[in-house]
Structures are given as structure tokens and as C-alpha cells.
Swiss-Prot record:
Classification via CDD domains: TOPRIM_recR
SUPFAM superfamilies (alphabetical): Recombination protein RecR
Zinc finger (C4-type): 57-72
InterPro entries from the UniProt entry: DNA_Rcmb_RecR, Rcmb_RecR, Rcmb_RecR_Znf, TOPRIM_dom, TOPRIM_RecR
Any coiled-coil regions, as ranges: none
Protein name: Recombination protein RecR
Domain Toprim: 80-175
């Protein structure tokens, strides 16, 4: 089927979302245009406001509308623990476990084949944060249990070991090959409780 340029543009815009293919994007676009124009307008307005108003926390780099996210602005958090995650969705997943320490959000994981080295994902900024804060006694590496996530955790653990800092890895109650934001809170809480230091 051939779509007009504006409909094609809308379909292509929906396809930037993860897990949305051609058919799903077509259904979404046609649903909004045929049956829910007011919903489409609300979606466009909310998307525009979020794109303009949401940035990154200057401390942990998660998504926020303020200079500091709620976790970094909270003085009651444990300043001796730092949890390193791959993305903002992982912060929300870890928060469900009752974790009360600080965070640092990488921009993904190491993937040399995709051109993502330490600088691209923010490892130098992580090491700078650890040095500047000076209060962390344990760094919990909560990268995804994928090959790339494991490689990222090992790389960071080596840097921390060289500085005499303790690095731990969340236990693997989280399924290998899984994504943190898809794991239920109970499983993730069990994984955090069973974390172990990374031996060097």
C-alpha cells in the first residue's frame, strides 16, 4: 500500500521506538489519524515537552527535568555505595529493590564492533565522579548480564582494582542475556542481596 508523504513520515517516526516494526508503526499511525486525533495531539505535545524539558542529571547522568535527579538530591542516600548501570531504565529497576546508595548511568556498554569504547559510554566521567566524591567504599557493577555487559563490568572492575577500590557484581539471579528493566523487583532484589566482589 502506498501512503501519502505525511502518513509515511508519521509511520517512520514510530519506527524509531524499540520493538516497533513496519506493521505496528502503520497500525499506530492509522489508529491516531482515524480514531484518536485528540490522543495524537496529546502525544505530540507530551513528546515535544519531554524532548525540550528533560535532560541529564549533572551527577549521575540519569534523565531528569532538574539539575539533579531525585536520587542525587536526596541527602539521606548512602554515600558509600555507587551503583553503575547501563541506562536510565536500569535506575528505575534498581530502585524497586530498596537500594539506597548513589548511581552512575553509563551510555550503554562497551561494544568495539559498534564503535563504543570507554569514552563513548562515559567511563572516564565515572572514574572522575568516584575520585571527586571520595566517599565510595563499594562500586556495584549492575550492567546487564550479556557478553557486552560482562565485558564492561570487567573493564571497570580492573580500573577500580588499580585504584584500590572494591567492585562487586550483582548476582546472577538475573537471567543471562536479560535486560535489567525487564526483570521483576523480587528477582532483582535477590540479585543485589547476593552480589559478590569481582576477583582480580
Amino acid at each position: 500500500m502506498s501512503f501519502s508523504p505525511l502518513i509515511r513520515q508519521l509511520i517512520d517516526a514510530f519506527r524509531v521506538l524499540p520493538g516497533v516494526g513496519q506493521k505496528t508503526a502503520q497500525r499506530m499511525a492509522l489508529q491516531l489519524l482515524e480514531r484518536d486525533r485528540s490522543g495524537g495531539s496529546r502525544l505530540a505535545q507530551a513528546l515535544g515537552q519531554a524532548m525540550d524539558g528533560v535532560g541529564h542529571c549533572r551527577s549521575c547522568r540519569t534523565l531528569t527535568e532538574e539539575e539533579l535527579c531525585p536520587q542525587c538530591a536526596d541527602p539521606r542516600r548512602d554515600d558509600t555505595l555507587l551503583c553503575v548501570v547501563e541506562g536510565p531504565t536500569d535506575v528505575y529497576a534498581v530502585e524497586q529493590t530498596g537500594y539506597r546508595g548513589r548511581y552512575f548511568v553509563l551510555k550503554g556498554h562497551l561494544s568495539p564492533l559498534d564503535g563504543l569504547g570507554p569514552e563513548a559510554i562515559g567511563i572516564p566521567q565515572l572514574m572522575e565522579r568516584i575520585s571527586q566524591q571520595g566517599t565510595f567504599t563499594e562500586v556495584i557493577l549492575a550492567t546487564n548480564p550479556t557478553v557486552e555487559g560482562e565485558a564492561t563490568a570487567h573493564y571497570i572492575a580492573q580500573l577500580l582494582h588499580d585504584k584500590g577500590l572494591v567492585a562487586s557484581r550483582i548476582a546472577h539471579g538475573v537471567p543471562l542475556g536479560g535486560e535489567l528493566d525487564l526483570v521483576d523487583g523480587g528477582t532483582l532484589a535477590h540479585s543485589f542481596a547476593g552480589r559478590k566482589p569481582i576477583a582480580m
